Curated annotation (Swiss-Prot):
This protein's name: UPF0735 ACT domain-containing protein Clos_1956
Domain ACT, residue spans: 70-145
InterPro entries tied to this protein: ACT-like_dom_sf, ACT_dom, UPF0735_ACT_dom-cont
Pfam family, one: ACT_4
Organism domain of life: Bacteria
Family classification: Belongs to the UPF0735 family.
CDD domains (UniProt xref): ACT_PheB-BS
Length: 146
């Protein structure tokens, strides 16, 4: 994996095996099972499949690939929308590094935020879902994970 390149891919287009490997790793990490055999049986995969992929499949939150994320937003031009986004990042221990905001055009503004996720208190996926639920967040994309 020294010269590996990483991709961010929506799990909807991947074979189920990858998500099942993640589930088995989570069972092991949280001590809900005694070992690999029990974990693989619980999620319905073979041990060989688990061992084949376990070192190559991560969630965004689990990955040691990087500790900075760049998010791109399309926000409606209403009072408090950006403040609410920043609040969610802050209360989850995200450390905001940069914010770039364009002037609103047709009542929408593009915003890019880079923040450190080293100390976040929730999974990145959960934080993103929380941000997406804010009234006025019209679009959110992960541009980079470093």
């Amino acid at each position: 994996m020294n010269n590996s390149r990483f991709l961010v891919i929506d799990k909807e287009i991947l074979p189920d095996i990858f998500e099942k490997v993640i589930e088995a790793k989570e069972l092991l990490r949280t001590n809900q099972v005694k070992g690999v055999t029990e974990a693989t049986k619980a999620v319905g995969i073979s041990r060989s499949a688990f061992y084949k992929y376990k070192d190559y499949v991560y969630t965004l939150s689990d990955s040691n690939v990087g500790k900075k994320v760049t998010l791109s937003f399309l926000l409606s031009h209403q009072a408090g929308v950006l403040s609410n986004v920043l609040h969610i990042i802050s209360v989850n221990n995200g450390n905001i590094l940069t914010i770039n905001q364009d002037s609103p055009i047709n009542n929408f503004a593009n915003v890019n935020i880079i923040f450190d996720i080293t100390e976040i208190s929730k999974k990145l996926d959960d934080i993103i879902q929380e941000i997406e639920s804010i009234d006025g967040v019209e679009k959110l994309e992960i541009l980079a994970l470093e």
